[in-house]
Amino acid sequence: SNAPEALPDTGPMAFYLAADTEFGVPRAMLHVSLRRPDGLISVADSVRARLYRNLVEDDLNALSYPALLAGVSYGISTPDRGFRISLGGYQDKQSELLQVVLDRLTSLTINPDRFLVLKTELENSLQDSFKNRPFQQGFDRLRQNILSSSWPATDQLAELATVTPEDLSLWRDAYFEQVGVEALAVGNLDMAAAQRIQAQLANSLVITPTAAAAPTVTQIDGPVTEVMDIDHNDASLVFYLQNKDDTLLETAKSNLLGHIIAPEYFSSLRTEQQLGYVVSAFSPEFEQQGGLGFVIQSPSAPAAALHQKTLEFLAGEVTRLADMSAEDYAQNQEGLIAQV
């Protein structure tokens, strides 16, 4: 597809079109972000958005099969910046579906019985997270320590307990009283079709310029160690090295380093030393903040030993990387580029 092009004269809305007519099929994708200044970052907003999204999708379930038969699909998500509607499939059928989803999202009459069912389902899902494998719980805790929009299940459960149908309706009304809108259309549609979608959004919403909210990313100052009490026989380690800044150059460096050392980490700690059955090195990104991550779960070695073996591995990698030939380095660069 072509590079996205901003539609002219859209007022406070930002609307981008990436037209792609190469295959001649009348299909397109549409993503619409509906934003508030604070986003969905606080635990109160995050929990309410998740529950409300579930209620809307539950109410729209009767539409799913007819939409599929008509060659279109939809989804509603709740990223940090705000609610997002996504549509896909035949472009000429999307306008009607978009209107139904918009109307339901902004003005759903909450059924108390369905509210209770879906609230209980969300509570059970959060409770189940306490049973996740140790390495999963460890990485969740890392995310919670780094990102201001990531909340422990205990905090979410406490907030969820306070939510009533009336409270949720009032929260929804306040959210959609006025919103910022950013939309992207990709596929086989022209400027005129995109402008019709833009007009439809403008007629359905009260739109105001709104900067995209973003969670705070904690910058780690010196080594931080946290020991988690998890009811499991295995030991686990989540080891994170944060880049010095969130520039694209630093992220590219850590991604390349992760690409180079990940197979060696698995080979050394899993295959050769047989320290654990979950062994992985990777390059996690929190917003734009890059870094390196190491995860291992072991039925035989304590966490302190997993930490020490990871440090020994990294010390050995310093020497291996210093001795790497230009050809091997270039081959790794090309391998990573092929994956991007």
Give each language-model segment a name.
Residues I197-A211:
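Glycine-centered hinge/linker elements that transmit conformational signals in sensory
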Residues N203-V206, I261-A262, E312-A315:
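C-terminal, active-site-flanking charged/polar segments
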Residues F139, R143, P165-L201:
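Non-catalytic, conformational "gating/processing" segments within enzyme and secreted inhibitor domains
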Residues S1-R53, P209-E264:
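His/Glu-based metal-binding/catalytic segments typifying zinc-dependent metallopeptidases
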Residues G24-S107, V117-A161, Q178-V186, D234-D245, ...:
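M16 family metallopeptidases and their MPP-like homologs
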Residues L17-T21, G71-G75, S169-R172, V224-D229, ...:
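Short beta-strand/turn micro-motifs at beta-sheet edges
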